[in-house]
C-alpha cells in the first residue's frame, strides 16, 4: 500500500472518528437530560456525559482531532439545545480541552492507568478555576469552594468514566 493511500485512509478514519465524537458529545448529554430528574443541579453535573466521548476518542483520535472535537462539541450542543448555558459554555470548553489533552497524553504514551480519567477531570477543573480566576483578576481561596462542591457532585460521573477507561485500557492491550 502506498504512503498516499495510507495517509488518505488515516485522514478519513480520523475525520469519521472526530465526527462520531462530536455527535456523541451532543447526543449523550441530550439522553442524560431526557431522564426524569428533580433537583436544582442538572443530572449532567452528576453523570458527566460530555466527558465520555473525549475519553473514548482519546484511544482512537489524534490529539489535534480531540482538541477540535472538544471545541466544536460543546459549541454545537449549545447552539442546538441551549445546553450548556452561555455562562457555563466557556468553562465546559476549557475543562474539556484540559481533560482531553491530559487523557490523550497518557494514552499516547502508553501509560494509561485506572483512575487517569478521574484525575484528568479533577486537574482540568482545578486548572480551569485557576485560569478563569487569573483572567478575571479574582484569584482567591474562595474560588475553590465551588470547585470542591462540583467534584463532590461529579463522583458518580467519575465512577462512570473510570469503568469506561478500565474497559478501554483492557481492550487496547
Residue ranges and their predicted role:
Residues 33-44, 86-90, 105-173:
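Membrane-embedded alpha-helical hairpins and interfacial helices in multi-pass inner-membrane proteins
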Residues 10-22, 47-51, 66, 88, ...:
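Residue-level signature of transmembrane alpha-helical entry/exit and packing/kink sites
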Residues 1-6, 169-173:
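Short, charged juxtamembrane terminal tails flanking transmembrane helices
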Residues 67-104:
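Helix-adjacent hinge/juxtasegments
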Residues 65-76, 114-124:
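Central hydrophobic cores of alpha-helical transmembrane segments
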Amino acid at each position: 500500500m502506498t504512503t498516499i493511500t495510507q495517509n488518505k485512509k488515516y485522514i478519513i478514519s480520523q475525520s469519521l472518528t472526530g465526527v462520531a465524537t462530536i455527535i456523541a458529545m451532543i447526543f449523550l448529554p441530550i439522553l442524560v437530560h431526557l431522564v426524569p430528574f428533580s433537583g436544582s443541579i442538572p443530572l449532567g453535573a452528576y453523570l458527566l456525559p460530555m466527558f465520555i466521548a473525549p475519553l473514548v476518542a482519546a484511544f482512537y483520535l489524534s490529539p489535534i482531532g480531540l482538541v477540535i472535537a472538544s471545541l466544536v462539541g460543546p459549541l454545537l450542543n449549545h447552539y442546538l439545545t441551549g445546553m450548556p448555558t452561555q455562562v457555563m459554555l466557556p468553562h465546559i470548553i476549557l475543562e474539556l480541552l484540559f481533560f482531553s489533552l491530559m487523557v490523550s497524553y497518557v494514552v499516547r504514551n502508553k501509560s494509561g492507568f485506572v483512575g487517569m480519567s478521574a484525575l484528568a477531570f479533577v486537574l482540568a477543573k482545578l486548572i480551569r478555576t485557576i485560569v478563569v480566576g487569573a483572567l478575571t483578576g479574582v484569584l482567591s481561596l474562595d474560588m475553590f469552594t465551588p470547585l470542591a462542591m462540583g467534584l463532590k457532585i461529579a463522583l458518580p460521573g467519575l465512577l462512570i468514566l473510570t469503568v469506561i477507561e478500565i474497559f478501554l485500557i483492557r481492550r487496547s492491550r
